[in-house]
Amino acid sequence: MDDSSINKELKQKLNVSYCEEESESEGQKEAPESRETQSQTPDWAEGQESEAKFTPPRTPSSSIHGVGTFEEKDKMSPDQALRTPGPGFHKCPGTPAQPDSRSEVVHCESPYTPKSLLSQSVISSTEKLPSRGSKHLRFTPVPFVDEMTSSALVNINPFTPESYRKQFLRSNGKRKTRGDLEEADPGEGKVEQGLPAKRCVLRETNMASRYEKEFLEVEKIGVGEFGTVYKCIKRLDGCVYAIKRSMKPVAGLSNENLALHEVYAHAVLGHHPHVVRYYSAWAEDDHMIIQNEYCNGGSLQTAISENTKSGNHFPELKLKDILLQISLGLKYIHNSGMVHLDIKPSNIFICHKMQCDSPVVPEEIENEADWFLSANVMYKIAGDLGHVTSISKPKVEEGDSRFLANEILQEDYQHLPKADIFALGLTIAVAAGAESLPANGAKWHHIREGNLPDIPQKLSEEFHNLLKNMIHPDPSERPSAAGLARSRVLRPSLRKAEELQQQLNLEKSKTATLERELREAQQAWSPQEEHSDPGVSGTPTGSRCTKRPVGGKSAKSSSFTCGKSSP
């Protein structure tokens, strides 16, 4: 064989070995699926035999010279370009160019990459994937903008205490409140905290009716200023609830804020024995629906109407019970930093305690921390909470003018809790049998001057004065809800308890005085014993033994006989 043919054969073998080294080095970096397709390239003599054994899918030549082909040409050296086979050898897969890093895989340079992977690589490049060390794992990559948008859809309750509001969505520093997101975006204007609400929070689209699915409507039990109340049985637990449906759709911004305002008040008040319990709320068919506790005794207004028809009235003892229980509810509301501003008979509900089949053990009632838990009849504040506002940042909406305090009409909000006391005093007067209260006119002003309406029944002087003091023209002179809860007029047992407490404190003081005198006497006796003569007895009586030193100048006994001594 001549020299030219030998040189040509050696050159061809060198080219093949060079391709084999490149394919081996890249095979270690490629994914497992690319390792199978990128096998070592045989020499040209064995090309037909290897192709007969395995023929992978081929990309048409037009696709090879399409997307990404110019990048491959730029990365190849001039020597590699000379060794690249021509169009006639497109059946043999070429080795793709080595990627810049392990994390980047140029799918378009491999003729065996499906088009679906090519499209996914283009789409995924526009999204921000979560880091490997992230604690929150997602099945699908979610853009960062979506997470900010979902956080911004969380309403902030305006009645939530400021210290708690800063923490309730910032657990471990991972979540941000809606206000923080708004401050982070300088393009958005400042929005009042909690208002307006995001529209999508109040709408449920493409969903079955939750009201019809979860509840069985029994009857309509009331109609208020803001909605209609229905008695319903929940299909899951079989318990009875009061479901309130807003009268007007919440599509408008003002109606939407009003509906959310009532939900906010219900949610923050929580659970108290003298406040109707709130369970949940949702939007359905553009109406707000609130699930509350059901009170089987109806409203106080219904009971007053029945008494008026029958010519009866609540006795004074019952009136004191109503006043005391509602005062406890108002005390809880005022301590929560809010005022009701719509106290009236239609917003007070009655709950009769259900009798159990088994008798109640007396010890169980005695061990209760609160006396009202054993009461047979409970009075609770409920109704429309659309007028509830904050004491520190009031946004007052006037309630029923018949029970409205004059200072609210004059926009004097320095003593907002006392406006609830004024309305409660008139409510008890109506329950006592007073005629219907005027909405305006001379009689309206006469009551605001501190005069109770005419009450047909005779009340005790102390109770009458208490009611009169509750509607005092000066709100600062009215008692507080906490003061009413401690009133001796409403709780006569407190007087006896206070007397016993005073006697106990007096006896404790006497005992403490005696103990102090005893300690002083003991301290004075101890130094006297230390400085006394050791040879002299310190006690006049002979019961105390004396100490006598042995030896030295002490007298020694001269008789050791056991018999009788001689005279």
Curated annotation (Swiss-Prot):
Coiled coil feature spans: 497-523
Keyword Oxidoreductase on entry: no
Q: Where does ATP bind?
A: I221, G222, V223, G224, E225, F226, G227, T228, V229, K244
User: Can you quote a single GO CC term?
Assistant: cytoplasm
User: Keyword Transport: yes or no?
Assistant: no
Q: Where in the cell is it found?
A: Nucleus
One Pfam annotation reads Pkinase
Q: Please name the InterPro entries in this protein's record.
A: CC_SR_Kinase, Kinase-like_dom_sf, Prot_kinase_dom, Protein_kinase_ATP_BS, Ser/Thr_kinase_AS, Wee1-like_protein_kinase
Q: State the residue spans of region: Disordered.
A: 1-103, 170-191, 502-567
Q: What is this protein called?
A: Wee1-like protein kinase 2
Organism this protein belongs to? Canis lupus familiaris
